[in-house]
Swiss-Prot record:
Catalyzed reaction equations: L-glutaminyl-[protein] + H2O = L-glutamyl-[protein] + NH4(+)
Organism whose genome encodes this protein: Bordetella parapertussis (strain 12822 / ATCC BAA-587 / NCTC 13253)
PANTHER family: CHEMORECEPTOR GLUTAMINE DEAMIDASE CHED-RELATED (PTHR35147:SF2)
Protein name: Probable chemoreceptor glutamine deamidase CheD
Function: Probably deamidates glutamine residues to glutamate on methyl-accepting chemotaxis receptors (MCPs), playing an important role in chemotaxis.
Entry-linked InterPro entries: CheD-like_sf, Chemorcpt_Glu_NH3ase_CheD, Cytotoxic_necrot_fac-like_cat
Amino acid sequence: MPARLDARATRRYFDSAFNSPAVKILPNEYYVTNGEDVMLSTVLGSCVAACIHDPVIGVGGMNHFMLPEGDIHSPASATMRYGAFAMEVLINELLKAGAVRERLEAKVFGGGAVLSAMQLMNIGERNGQFVLNYLKTEGIPVRAQDLGDVHARRINYFPRDGRVMVRKMAPHHQKAEALIAQREAAAAQTVQAETRAAPRVERFARPGGMPV
């Protein structure tokens, strides 16, 4: 996969508060573990993060997308900024790592109406509804959710056991608002720009009889 269009997160650090190695997930990125004991962390405004894992083997991953779906005829739709593509990439990578589709469980977060521009476009609500509908269609149960509201959120996810720690940031928190405004404004500008064609993702097989 092209690093810029559907990027696997690479920013590693040690989180002293949780005494754990960690990977920072930025907008339009994802990360899937392969049995490693690591925390995945991201900050969300109107964006949504899906945390999905296989509880039997302790493999899990997180994505971070900005918009639900793009024009299916546009090459820009096949990028991690769009939920439809980001969810497909995440699930595909989990299956490649040994997860069993019937055992997958999800927790979803974000979709806040944090910035006035995003409120007008209803982006957060659309993202939240999209991820719930997507998981329902694919038969993946949602074990926990924290969507909507006016708060930015910091998400710390432990894929090995599925734990998630959510910290809501107070409205008008200057540092949080500046960070989110910068990231989401940049992402919004990127969405408007033309992007080169991305390779198609091979769709995962859906077993017969799965609930939709």
